[in-house]
Curated annotation (Swiss-Prot):
Protein function: Plays a critical role in the incorporation of lipoproteins in the outer membrane after they are released by the LolA protein.
Lipidation (S-diacylglycerol cysteine): C22
Name the record gives this protein: Outer-membrane lipoprotein LolB
Lipid-binding residues (covalent, N-palmitoyl cysteine): C22
Subunit structure: Monomer.
Organism of this sequence: Shigella boydii serotype 18 (strain CDC 3083-94 / BS512)
Any one annotated GO CC term: cell outer membrane
Alphabetized Gene3D superfamilies for the sequence: Lipoprotein localisation LolA/LolB/LppX
CDD domains in UniProt: LolB
Signal peptide segment: 1-21
Gene Ontology biological process terms, A to Z: lipoprotein localization to outer membrane; protein transport
Amino acid sequence: MPLPDFRLIRLLPLAALVLTACSVTTPKGPGKSPDSPQWRQHQQDVRNLNQYQTHGAFAYISDQQKVYARFFWQQTGQDRYRLLLTNPLGSTELELNAQPGNVQLVDNKGQRYTADDAEEMIGKLTGMPIPLNSLRQWILGLPGDATDYKLDDQYRLSEITYSQNGKNWKVVYGGYDTKTHPAMPANMELTDGGQRIKLKMDNWIVK
């Protein structure tokens, strides 16, 4: 099936990515050791989550395109998740449903696509090389396969450096939502050369 000329409506102002919630804490002071028991406990608490969902603002910025959207991310089980991107008017631009061995994506024209790899599909259909497979861990504040990372003074991720498939991603966490337990990321930015991905999570629901 030919790939569509798929581009999200780019109307969401970048200012919407500014954090305003008083419950967000930002890293202060020197970071902690990745070998600390507090960090191991935090990772275990996050991994123990069976279901979670979050929504907020998304921005992808490169020399070729600038995309702004609202997003909704829901995980309902191991390797089962749903990603929804909407424009500022609330219309769906992209809906992705993934489960083991099957990924389905519906674009803003109602066209349905199937594949085995969500990251590859999103890249081909949107032109945005989003590291979705790693982002599923990073958005939770977990390093995933990355071994080069730093912690903040509260034993949470503050920075990740990760190289794969010719990409050199740097992830910086700007704050955490302390209304949830465990505390979850509230603001993060991914960069690779001239590409930037910004995520601002409005809230989390975890189980």
